[in-house]
Amino acid sequence: MPSNICKFFLTWWLIQQVTGLTGPLMLDTAPNAFDDQYEGCVNKMEEKAPLLLKEDFNKSEKLKVAWEEAKKRWNNIKPSMSYPKGFNDFHGTALVAYTGSIGVDFNRAVREFKENPGQFHYKAFHYYLTRALQLLSNGDCHSVYRGTKTRFHYTGAGSVRFGQFTSSSLSKTVAQSPEFFSDDGTLFIIKTCLGVYIKEFSFYPDQEEVLIPGYEVYQKVRTQGYNEIFLDSPKRKKSNYNCLYSSAGTRESCVSLFLVVLTSLLVQLLCLAEP
């Protein structure tokens, strides 16, 4: 009996871990993503984030290297840039770093956060990147394009969001270039009101990038043909977590994280109990 129970839960857990390996990906509300907006705890996070960043560096050499590379570029470009009050070197470095090699691994960790929160080594990076976009946002909306090599499917019902930070371009030509798009993929045509034009920060300014936070919600979704999806946002946000890594974390966020970790532990304990 313990063996059957173990197999059942282990199978269920593995299914939760594997997404998008075959067939199209579902375009939904990204329920597994880490989507903190840090509302009401910015001051506490500004104090705590440098310590969290050191902890993340100790657990991820890749992040440490990417951060140092981005820091050099930020120090070179910041004298010629203007940025809002409260925007500091941590915010600038995080934004530059995202456009480099760390972006793919970071977004994977953000998307899969709920599946393995104990292995999330981007606590400070997520905060600094989120805060950078919040500070730079001026309320302007942008019409942008995002090409992917993966096919996405929309059920036809309900609002959607990306969950992860999402790179897009003002240029349709860039979005449809072979580097980002294939005939088997999806072309997103997006109206974003929370996305920020970050060309000046990017390692690749020719990409004309607009970076969209994962918590932006699109209430108007329309498909066209077999590989085009139109998304329209009326400046709406949605987050399942808030201030999780500050002492001001909401009860709901802490309970949610506790349940995720508890589920993982139960699966492991059931398997260990097998004779």
UniProtKB/Swiss-Prot annotation:
Binding site for NAD(+): Y98, R146, Q164, S202
Cell membrane recorded as keyword: yes
Disulfide bonds, paired cysteine numbers: C41-C243, C141-C193
Catalytic site positions: R146, S167, E209
GO cellular component: external side of plasma membrane
Signal peptide: 1-20
Residue ranges annotated as propeptide in the record: 247-275
SUPFAM superfamilies tied to this protein: ADP-ribosylation
UniProt tissue specificity: Postthymic T-cells.
Keywords, alphabetical: Cell membrane, Disulfide bond, Glycoprotein, Glycosyltransferase, GPI-anchor, Hydrolase, Lipoprotein, Membrane, NAD, NADP, Nucleotidyltransferase, Signal, Transferase
Positions where lipid (GPI-anchor amidated serine) attaches: S246
Cellular localization per UniProt: Cell membrane
Residues annotated as domain TR mART core: 61-238
EC number per UniProt: 2.4.2.31, 3.2.2.5
Keyword Nucleotide-binding: no
Catalytic activity of the protein: L-arginyl-[protein] + NAD(+) = N(omega)-(ADP-D-ribosyl)-L-arginyl-[protein] + nicotinamide + H(+); NAD(+) + H2O = ADP-D-ribose + nicotinamide + H(+)
Membrane-spanning ranges: none
Gene Ontology MF term list: hydrolase activity, acting on glycosyl bonds; NAD+ nucleosidase activity; NAD+ poly-ADP-ribosyltransferase activity; NAD+-protein-arginine ADP-ribosyltransferase activity; nucleotidyltransferase activity
Membrane topology designation: Lipid-anchor; GPI-anchor
One Gene Ontology term from the biological process aspect of the record: NAD catabolic process
Positions annotated as glycosylated: N58
Family to which this protein belongs: Belongs to the Arg-specific ADP-ribosyltransferase family.
Function: Has NAD(+) glycohydrolase activity and extremely low ADP-ribosyltransferase activity.
Record protein name field: T-cell ecto-ADP-ribosyltransferase 1
Organism from which the protein derives: Rattus norvegicus (Rat)
Lineage, opening ranks: Eukaryota, Metazoa, Chordata, Craniata, Vertebrata
The gene coding this protein: Art2a
